[in-house]
């Protein structure tokens, strides 16, 4: 069933454009249904917006500004013909919100914005590729500054910080929809958000603060509990290296956790599926005599326990949980000078002191300061999605259980708070959480991490098909970014990804590489008879 066209479409478009102050001549063009050519989009007057580039790109001819900083290389050679718009939104006198909007010749009638990672600071062209291939008018922003993913040196300008926290995404939603309507002569039938990490946080913030912006939101591994997450970054950083846990021991911890809990689901596949009941204890690795490469000193055991515990305040209350068993190698990112995001955030935003030392971090004092400074601007933990749900909005959140940067337990806590706020029936009809066993941060990992999140969301909104178990695959080794060593070979397999709180459970006899041999079962529910099988790697 195709999405219904809006009644009185011309008037609706004209009204929407008038709200953002579009010049009457162009509003008249849109009312008449006359599309604006790609080149002429440079002349469309949208207040506070400057379009610097509006160019037609023939099929297969786009060349990106730079290779992606992480992830596999992107193949741009198969891109269809599209109109590429590059512009800037001057939301305030300090603002410099840069964006790209890609408008395909063969449009599917829908609009999408994609999210960012870390501290943003760049337009993520790679995130536009798949939506464009699907026919979306799709856009992305640098959120108002240029910089690396863990850098907050730009945040001394208060309005640019607000742009990053939430404003840039909303401003681009309005401007992107308007430019899309001009180009095609009508507004989009549906609007979608797709993002992970900071992009997941941005998606939740849209649902909470601007519930009318998007019909459907995919929020992966959301960095939603913002100040607490920055504190977790510092906690991990402080407990790694000299005087703590050696980075060279992170793989030892991961292997021990897998050995302790992998077979609990009946399949020894290096994926901990019963993650909630895994009872791995790092004291089992404590060296019985002198230190070796395969055991931990008492100091290292204590450091690992502190990281697993997450951020705990002076009353013994968990502020944000630690990351899951099997996620340990990813902790090293927070100890890297290139991604000491928590330290950079506290130095530039909270303490406003370039010499602030994370060794002096005090949970009770400094987290309270951070929450006061943020004042809910970046934080996206408000469980009241009633306005978003009331207008038919749908939300899919996903999170890998071996995400070592953002704990999946935070997504569980938020989802449960939303269910309590909305009530089980309304929540079931509008929000879904999927925990992906063995998936790292947003993608990758030992598990079946390749999932099409967008199609189930489209079917839910456009066809009324409520998503249940989704198909997930662990593909053969994929190439890393340019210059990276080749990924180790691993056999492909498939699994179902289950709506929380269900978990995938082996049927006891089928092919362990086939998702059909697994079913989604409520924790504590009746499970099929199981036997442990090995999957080689």
Model-identified regions with their sequence ranges:
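Alpha/beta-hydrolase fold nucleophile elbow
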Residues: 186-197
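Cap/lid segment of the alpha/beta-hydrolase catalytic domain
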Residues: 108, 117-188, 231-232, 239, ...
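Catalytic-loop region of hydrolases
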Residues: 27-110, 124-126, 268, 272, ...
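Short beta-strand/loop motif that positions the catalytic acidic residue
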Residues: 397-399
